[in-house]
Every structure is written in C-alpha cells, then in structure tokens.
C-alpha cells in the first residue's frame, strides 16, 4: 500500500499498519516494573515479619536471662544456708519459682549448677569474661607502685570473698563425699593459684622480692592468704570488718614478699 507524506515530509503510517502487540522489549520492561513492585511489597512484609520475630526473640532471651539469674541466686542462698548435700535441685527450682525441668535444662546437674554459682560469685556477674581480663585488673596494673597495686587488688578480693566464701565452704564440705565436687574444688584451687601468680607478677613490675624468696614461694604465700577459709575465720569468727581484712591482705603481702618492707 502506498503511503503518503505529511506536510513535513514524514511518512504517515495508517492505523492498520501499526503493530497489534507491544515489542518484546516493552513487554519485558512492563514485567520488570510489576516484579519490582511486587518485590517491594514482599520486602516490606518480610522486613516487618523479621522485625517482629527479632522483638519476640529478644524478649525471650531477656526472660531466659532473668530466669537463669533467679536460679543462680536461689542456689547460692540455699547452698550457703542449708549446705550443698542437703539442697536438692527441686528445692532450688521452688525457691526460684520455676519448674525442675527448667533448672535441669538451664544447668544440667547439681555439680554443674554449683560450678556456675561459683563462677558468678567470684566474678560478680554471669558475663563470660575471665576475671583477670576485666577492667579492674587493668586499673590495678596501672598503679604507680606495689603498694597501690596491692591495695587495688585487695578491694576487689574482699568483694569477691563476700560473694563466694560461703559457697566455697559448702563445696569444701561436700567434696569429701562427692568426687564431682572434689574435682570442682581442685579446679578452683588451680584458678586461685593463677590469680596468686598474677598478683606476684604485678608486684614484680614495681619491686623485687625479699632476699631468699623465689617466685614459687611468693605465689604459695599469696595463694594461702587468699583462702576463703581464712577470710571466713577473720570476718565471721574474729569479727573483722571488710576494710580491715582488705588492709591486712595488702599489708601482709607487702611485708612478706616485697624487699625493703
């Protein structure tokens, strides 16, 4: 069919010659636009759902943490007041206001629960940060001399003794008839030795040991002075205040270990 030209010279295409379907590129563009719109809708829904799930998960985590804390506090009190051997997991669950299966799910066996109780009592919280990697240790090491270092350590030790000495005494009592607790006590004694070693090394950054005293003997001396039994006898049986205990600890180590004291 002949096609006429318009005034500007452009070829005029009759309507019958126009394509009845959009080119493939146009169809693809339209489909892509619809897909993007759908994706936006789905993405918004997914984000909302994920946000909701995250909120629920955070709430559950917080609740689990509070439950764990209640059980630890309940176990600590009962172990100290009633003794380890006579305190049952069921009694701990009742004291914490939770079910026995909940306690067993969170902690496993009674020896495992005692292990956690001691960790929390010594550190002061349930955070999985080693005691000697905490801020107080770095602060103590920043002191200008051995006396300042020992004074800072003694302040932290007295608080740890307040929290943990009673539980340790209950564990000592149970260890004689319970192999699991005996192993736990051995581990605690080793940890105390590591802390004593750290204290001696802290002293050596500022001063020398007394003549005739080697590092191993110095560590043993500090290890003994840190004994929770000693703390208990001085504060409970002899009526010492916590400040008197802390001052005695720091001064005793300085006099027994540091040259020139």
What kind of region is each of these model predictions?
Residues 1-66, 133:
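N-terminal intrinsically disordered/low-complexity leader segments
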Residues 36, 41, 204-251, 260-261:
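Hydrophobic/aromatic-rich alpha-helical bundle segments in the mid-to-C-terminal region
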Residues 70, 74, 78-112, 116:
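Helix-turn-helix
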Residues 84, 107, 173-178, 228:
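Short helix-capping/turn signature of helix-turn-helix
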Residues 106, 116-117, 199, 248:
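Residues in the recognition helix of alpha-helical DNA-binding motifs
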Residues 110-112, 116, 127-162, 219:
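Hydrophobic alpha-helical connector segments
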Residues 120-125:
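Short, basic, alpha-helical segments at the C-terminal edge of helix-turn-helix-like DNA-binding modules
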Residues 152-172, 179-207, 216-220, 247, ...:
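Amphipathic alpha-helical packing segments from all-alpha helical-bundle domains
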């Amino acid at each position: 069919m002949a096609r006429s030209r318009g005034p500007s010279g452009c070829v005029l295409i009759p309507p019958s010659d126009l394509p009845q379907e959009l080119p493939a590129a146009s169809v693809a563009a339209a489909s892509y636009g619809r897909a993007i719109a759908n994706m936006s809708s789905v993405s918004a829904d997914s984000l909302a759902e994920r946000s909701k799930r995250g909120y629920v998960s955070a709430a559950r985590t917080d609740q689990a943490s509070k439950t764990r804390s209640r059980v630890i506090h309940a176990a600590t009190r009962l172990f100290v007041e009633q003794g380890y051997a006579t305190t049952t997991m069921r009694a701990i669950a009742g004291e914490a206001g939770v079910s026995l299966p909940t306690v067993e799910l969170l902690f496993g066996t009674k020896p495992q629960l005692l292990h956690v109780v001691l960790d929390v009592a010594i550190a002061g919280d349930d955070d999985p940060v080693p005691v000697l990697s905490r801020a107080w240790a770095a602060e103590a090491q920043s002191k200008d001399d051995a006396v300042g270092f020992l004074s800072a350590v003694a302040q932290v030790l007295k608080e740890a003794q307040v929290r943990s000495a009673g539980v340790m005494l209950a564990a000592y009592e149970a260890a004689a008839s319970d192999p699991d607790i005996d192993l736990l006590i051995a581990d605690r004694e080793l940890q105390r030795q590591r802390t004593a070693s750290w204290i001696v090394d802290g002293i050596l950054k500022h001063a020398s040991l007394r003549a005739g005293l080697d590092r191993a003997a110095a560590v043993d001396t500090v290890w003994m002075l840190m004994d929770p039994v000693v703390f208990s006898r001085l504060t409970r049986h002899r009526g010492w205040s916590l400040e008197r205990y802390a001052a005695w600890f720091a001064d005793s180590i300085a006099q027994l270990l540091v040259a020139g004291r």
